[in-house]
A protein has these predicted regions:
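Conserved SAM/SAH-binding beta-strand->alpha-helix loop
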Residues: 83
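A short glycine-rich, Lys/Arg-flanked "PGG" loop and its adjoining helix->strand segment in the class I
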Residues: 144-158
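S-adenosyl-L-methionine
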Residues: 1-55, 63-70, 91-120
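Conserved beta-strand/loop positions that form the S-adenosyl-L-methionine
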Residues: 57, 80
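Conserved glycine-rich SAM-binding loop
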Residues: 60
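Conserved beta-strand signature within the Rossmann-like core of class I S-adenosyl-L-methionine
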Residues: 158-166
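Class I S-adenosyl-L-methionine
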Residues: 173-255
């Protein structure tokens, strides 16, 4: 069966790579890199254990996932990033700290989630500062849309958390709309909008750059809630008129 090509959310640019990063990609990849073969990945075999597991998509230079993996050796961390200099930098950090709980994939995250990761694989998924594609004609390239959020929700275990952040307001509003609309996600914000920056997330270079440009930062947090999804489905079937009113109210609240 032919799978339609998706619009990529990234452009591979020839970024400057240091000699150390080049060596890391050659020498450290066998220890930390994950090769994509046929079929879904066996994450328990890759990490050599069954432990709480987090995924970071688009980790940049590894500021967040590197810190978390160092601080929480009892948890396993999988990072996905397409830009090789950032991958090399994280591999160097992992080797210096002798991390045993970190693995890296250098590939398109959309394809990895769709083809290589089993549903219910993660306790936490992080997507911080994806490319905002700020020009309107490029909005179709944005990573966070309804289809991708549905994939993220599927990869979470029940009760698992999804966290996102951006420094572009209209992208934050798009994230909010699609996440609030997903039937498997329940907002961790009391008013179904944004949450404070979590303490565990250090300010990234993208965040610092945005602050210098006068941008705000918007954090979002959700939990996977199969119970909420089932209740909403039952309520919609029993009260179709009330459900339509609820949806309209939600749209107004989400601005």
């Amino acid at each position: 069966m032919h799978t339609p090509r998706h619009i990529r959310s990234f452009v591979l640019r020839a970024g400057r790579m240091t000699a150390a990063q080049e060596r890391a990609l050659t020498q450290l990849w066998p220890a930390y890199g994950v090769e994509l073969g046929e079929g879904p990945l066996d994450l328990e075999a890759i990490f050599g254990r069954c432990a709480p597991r987090s995924l970071e998509i688009g980790f940049g230079v590894g500021e967040v996932i590197g810190k978390l993996a160092e601080q929480h050796p009892h948890k396993d961390y999988l990072g996905i990033e397409v830009h090789r200099p950032g991958v090399g930098r994280l591999l160097l950090r992992a080797a210096e700290a002798n991390m045993r709980n970190l693995r890296v994939i250098c590939h398109d995250a959309v394809e990895v989630l769709r083809d290589k990761l089993r549903d219910g694989s993660f306790d936490e998924i992080l997507v911080f500062f994806p490319d905002p594609w700020h020009k309107k004609r490029h909005h179709k390239r944005r990573l966070i849309d309804a289809a991708f959020v549905a994939e993220l929700a599927a990869k979470l275990r029940s009760g698992g958390t999804l966290r996102l952040a951006t420094d572009w307001q209209d992208y934050a509003e798009q994230m909010l709309a699609v996440c609030n609309a997903d039937p498997h996600l329940a907002s961790l914000s009391s008013d179904h909008t944004y949450v404070p920056r979590p303490d565990f997330r250090p300010p990234t270079r993208f965040e610092r750059r945005g602050e210098r440009l006068g941008h705000g930062v918007w954090d979002l947090a959700y939990a996977k809630s199969e119970t909420a999804s089932a209740l909403l489905s039952e309520e919609a079937a029993a009260n179709p008129v009330d459900d339509e009113l609820h949806r309209q109210s939600g749209k107004n609240h989400a601005r």
